[in-house]
Amino acid sequence: MKRFFLALLIFSLGNSLVEASDPAEDALRERMIKAGLLPGYLQAASIPSGIDLLPPPPAEGSAAAARDREGNERILASADSSRQQQAKIDAATVFPGVTHSFACALGIEIGDATTPALYRLLRRSLADFGLSTRPVKQKYMRPRPFLVNGKPPCTPNEIETLRNDGSYPSGHSAYGFGWGLILASVAPDRTDAVMRRGIDFGDSRQVCNVHWPSDVEQGRVLAAAVFARLQAEAEFRSDVETARKEVAAARASGASTPANCPR
């Protein structure tokens, strides 16, 4: 996760940083490009400040912290095997796979071959939503649930990375909710389904035992702020309109429902 955000930061700062980067950063950039990441729409200075917008995470010993503990215990106890499996799937942020469950909510395939404009819109906006959480994470470095409750996360291979990456707020929640907002703009009649998927995407991080409830809630707040700020970008508005027409045309032509969707 830390490397993921570093790659987003490199992209957001543009080629001037890349030209001055060391070989390790160049290699990281190449891997992230292969994963399908693209530079966002917003310059780093234009991304809403989570430090100004969000309250600090709940203080240890506070009633809010107790609610987070209770919420964490409740969701871990209630998640069945199918929900746990979906949470593992949602943990991966590699394109094109990360868009599949959102395609199920939208009702048509999302991909470079089927809906290239929408696919690019999601790839670019992920950087804006994801980067918005980074300064807050770095400021507070809130310990993740698995470090507190002693229960393993759903992705044990990421323990060492997540151990050194702040829990508050959730980046997954930010871009999951943000994608829900974008997809609702692209296909308004699918608003309920795509927003539910965006919410569930963030909730998967609670099922994975890597985020507290308040991490996920505040990730959504930050996503809403980023989405509002994106409306001021002509390129973003144009891309949303292009994606809207593309999706409408695909649906009118009888585009098939994605395969292997959760039931």
Where are these regions (language model features)?
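Interfacial helix-loop-helix junctions of multi-pass membrane proteins
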Residues: D200-Q231
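Hydrophobic alpha-helical bundle signature of multipass membrane enzymes
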Residues: S21-V207, A232, D239
